[in-house]
Amino acid sequence: MENKSLIGQVTQEQINSWKAKYGSVFYTTADNRIAYFRKPNRKELSYAMRLQDDPLAMIEMVLKSCCIGGDDTFIKEAEYLMGASALVEKLISVKKTEVGEL
């Protein structure tokens, strides 16, 4: 991430605090704005999976639930929300596992 000041940008100290609390911290930027996100918890994932038939609602739910700071434009305005939709894939990452029969 560049060192120029963005709308919603927080200090490294705040980011470190979030990392201590949430583990991973993700961000998205557009039009000189930045927002920060954490991974969803199990309850949020469960609810998101129920919204799979409505992708826009699922994206909105995940981003609104997981936004921890920065510029709230990304969760309030549709074009920013859709632009940040690629972030949902990172937030809901799945570990590849091996399955076998014994």
Regions found by a protein language model. Name each.
Residues 1-19:
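Short, basic/low-complexity N-terminal boundary segments at the transition from targeting/disordered tails
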